[in-house]
Each structure stands twice: as C-alpha cells, then as structure tokens.
C-alpha cells in the first residue's frame, strides 16, 4: 500500500475554495468529520486560494465553479498548467451547472460531487460519504501519473438490498449480447475513449459511472455527440438494443431485466450499495441473473471495490469479464479488487477493451 495522501501515513490535506461563507463552513465541517482528512483552510476566491497555497500546500482542492474575480474553470486551467494538483469540483445540483462541471473534468478535475444540502439524516450522511470519498480518491489519483489505490474495506449494504429474488436459468436462453460497464474516478474520460472506439452497430451497453444526479444527463448528451453509438441517460423501461449505450442516472440504481427475448433497464431508488447509488454491483448482479452467459462485464478505473463482487457473480454465471489494467487506470481500486477476487477473465489496457468487446460479441 503506497504511502502518501489518503493512506495511513497522514490525513489528506484539503483547501476549500467557494465564494459562499456558509458553503465553506459546511464543506469544512463535513470533511473534518473524516479522520482521514485535514482541512488546512478555506478561501473565498481563487486569489485568496493562491495566497493560502503559498503558506501551506494542500493535497487536494475542493473548488466551486461560479465565483467572483475569477471563475472556477479559469482557475482550474491555470492550476493544471502552472501548479498541477488534484481538484474536486463541488457543484450545486442545478442543470445549468452540469456542462461547466463536465468541462472541469476535461480540464483536469478528478471528481465532481454535489454540494451537501439540508435534508434528511440519511441524505446528509450520504452527502458526507460521497464528498469524503471523492477527496480521498482525488488524493490517490494525483494530478500527474496515476497512483494505485488500495480497495476500501468498509461495512456496506450488499446488492441484495436492491435486487429482487433471482429467476430460473430459463431467462438466460437468448442470443442477444449485452455489455455492462462500471467506472468511477477517471471513468468519464475512460468511457469517452471506450465508446468513441465502438462502431454504430456495437452491442447494447448499460453503464454505471459514479456521478451526481443531473450531471449524468449532460454526460450522456456530451458522449452522444462524440460517438457512433447513440448515448442517453437511462430511463425506466428503456430497451437495451444494438448501437445504443444507456448511462445510469445519478442517485438511482439501474438494473438489467429481461422481457421475452429483449433486455431492458429498471431504474429505481434504494440505499447506497458499496457506498454508491447507482452501484456497479447492483447492475452487474442483475446482469448475472438475467443475462448470464449472454453478458460481457467490464470494470474500469475507480476507487474502492464497487462492482468487484458483481463481476465475480457475472463470471460464475458464464459471462465474459474484463478488468482495465493498472497502467491505464487513473485509480486502480475497483479493477484491482475484481482481479484479487479472480473475477476478471482478461486484464486489458483501455485501448484494447473496445476491440475485445466486439470480438466477444461476434
């Protein structure tokens, strides 16, 4: 296990940058509640952030996009060019903020999370988990060459909390191939590369990318404009058909189902599974039950272990399984845990995954 930010060596040092004093206070309190994180300060704009960074170097910055004097995107570009550092974008759950947040990922931000809002106790706890996990993932990813991530070992709800009881093996008798994909930290760019390399008649795909609600719709629209396959945010009941990729909506679980000879998705609420909603484990386990040997499972870059057990269940059901390799993963957590469990038939660099998918689905 490597020493450095986010490991047992010392806490991750975080600088909070947001123009709202209330938000700065809230974010600092949420982050400070995690013993693996140390908040070294807060700044109301990028200029104040630079002054703070000169006094004490943070490991990670949380950054708002809408700020006075200099907007977050401009500051991010300057940071990446002059002083690369892991950045987590903290954005409001507003549709207008989705596109700038995606641009921030393209500019070098590691993660995008929603700002914590007032709500139920469960909602506040989930917001805390997501924010703290994002900061730790960013620290592991780093601004330069990716660093490996040790899988988190945490008490967690299993996918049984969301999945219905399995059906008989009779549901597996269909010839349609379906590809299920799971990704987290670093996944937005990895998925873009994966989907852009597929032809317009590629097998149907269902994808879980850990991302807040609202942002997944904008992410799907952006991919749709770049890829030969059609890409859309999944809606309950959407058919899984060749030439289309369905992106699981943020904050809801997406499951694969079968009706007659066709596959479709079910989108539903439910508890966090492996600290996430949507959960890769939920998607993979549903694919194991309803598609089995007709499925191909792919686990990609990401921190933690979401999807590792689901990929193992897919393999046991007869599906082909692939894990992204360490060299091309931004954070080698989810794939490494899947490999450790013996869940991956193949461990491949990112550029080799699209042609292998097509070969397996011929």
Curated annotation (Swiss-Prot):
Residue span(s) of domain Response regulatory: 13-130
Active-site positions on this chain: 184, 210, 306
CDD domains, A to Z: CheB_Rec, REC_CheB-like
Known catalytic reactions: [protein]-L-glutamate 5-O-methyl ester + H2O = L-glutamyl-[protein] + methanol + H(+); L-glutaminyl-[protein] + H2O = L-glutamyl-[protein] + NH4(+)
Post-translational modification: Phosphorylated by CheA. Phosphorylation of the N-terminal regulatory domain activates the methylesterase activity.
This protein's GO CC annotations: cytoplasm
Gene Ontology biological process terms in this record: chemotaxis
Enzyme Commission number: 3.1.1.61, 3.5.1.44
Location of this chain's protein in the cell: Cytoplasm
Sites bearing 4-aspartylphosphate, chain numbering: 64
Phosphoprotein is among the record's keywords: yes
One Pfam family, short name: CheB_methylest
Keywords in alphabetical order: Chemotaxis, Cytoplasm, Hydrolase, Phosphoprotein
Main location: cytoplasm
The keyword Cytoplasm is assigned to this record: yes
Source species, domain of life: Bacteria
Any one Gene Ontology molecular-function term assigned to this protein's record: protein-glutamine glutaminase activity
Residue stretches making up the CheB-type methylesterase domain: 172-362
Protein family: Belongs to the CheB family.
Comment text on domains: Contains a C-terminal catalytic domain, and an N-terminal region which modulates catalytic activity.
Function recorded in the entry: Involved in chemotaxis. Part of a chemotaxis signal transduction system that modulates chemotaxis in response to various stimuli. Catalyzes the demethylation of specific methylglutamate residues introduced into the chemoreceptors (methyl-accepting chemotaxis proteins or MCP) by CheR. Also mediates the irreversible deamidation of specific glutamine residues to glutamic acid.
The name this protein goes by in its record: Protein-glutamate methylesterase/protein-glutamine glutaminase 5
